[in-house]
From Swiss-Prot:
Annotated protein name in UniProt: Large ribosomal subunit protein uL4
Any one Gene Ontology molecular-function term assigned to this protein's record: rRNA binding
Quaternary structure annotation from Swiss-Prot or TrEMBL: Part of the 50S ribosomal subunit.
Record gene name: rplD
Spans annotated as Disordered: 50-76
UniProt-listed Gene3D superfamilies: 3.40.1370.10
GO cellular component terms given for this protein: ribonucleoprotein complex; ribosome
Length: 207
């Protein structure tokens, strides 16, 4: 069990928390991390690429010239692939690039990503974000007080509209919940700021 300071939003220490080594202290599995990142990136692809084959190209209903007697090669339609403006053979069609990964591997990838951040001193635990209203300037000051880098992933226990709206216009800052935590967001961020309640919830799910 690793011991972490729990900070207030003004940067002072309010207590400490013990985080499970099974979630935040394992040896990161790079191959599983790589596979999980590829899976998420594949799922983000639109897959809307398309071309027209010979059945989709307009025109070409009439035989361009008679079968025999012209001395030229026989042709059935001007929309065959060898013609300019003809259909494409074996071209791309709309498809989904998403694929699935076993649950145990997904959880191992998450534990690996969290452990990597912890080992790189990229994990900060705060007591809570108590914003009564969305305040972008105030939120930016909090991150500055906590000495956070430009790319930060903020993790709350549940959806917090005030936190989300406060961080929305700050470049490089992303907000998610403990339930919505994913490998791509963790690895893209330079630092992870997680509330005490969210850390416990992550341990419950992944521990």
């Amino acid at each position: 069990m690793a011991n972490y300071d729990v900070l207030k939003l003004d940067g002072t220490k309010s207590g400490s928390i013990e985080l499970s080594d099974a979630v935040f202290g394992i040896e990161p599995n790079n191959s599983v991390l790589f596979e999980a990142i590829n899976l998420q990136r594949a799922s983000l692809r639109q897959g809307t690429h398309a071309v027209k084959n010979r059945s989709a190209v307009s025109g070409g209903g009439r035989k361009p010239w008679k079968q025999k007697g012209t001395g030229r090669a026989r042709q059935g339609t001007i929309r065959a692939p060898q013609w300019r403006g003809g259909g494409i053979v074996f071209g791309p069609t709309p498809r989904s690039y998403a694929y699935k990964m076993p649950k145990k591997m997904r959880r191992l990838a998450l534990r690996s990503a969290l452990s990597f951040k912890a080992q790189e001193n990229g994990l900060t635990v705060v007591d809570a974000f108590n914003f009564e209203a969305p305040k972008t300037k105030e939120f930016k000051n909090v991150l500055s007080t906590l000495e956070q880098p430009k790319k930060v992933l903020v993790v709350t226990e549940n959806e917090d509209v005030n936190v989300e709206l406060s961080a929305r216009n700050i470049p490089g800052v992303q907000v998610t919940t403990a339930q919505g935590l994913n490998v791509l967001d963790i690895t893209n961020a330079d630092s992870l700021v997680i509330t005490e309640a969210a850390a416990k919830k992550v341990e419950e799910v992944l521990g």
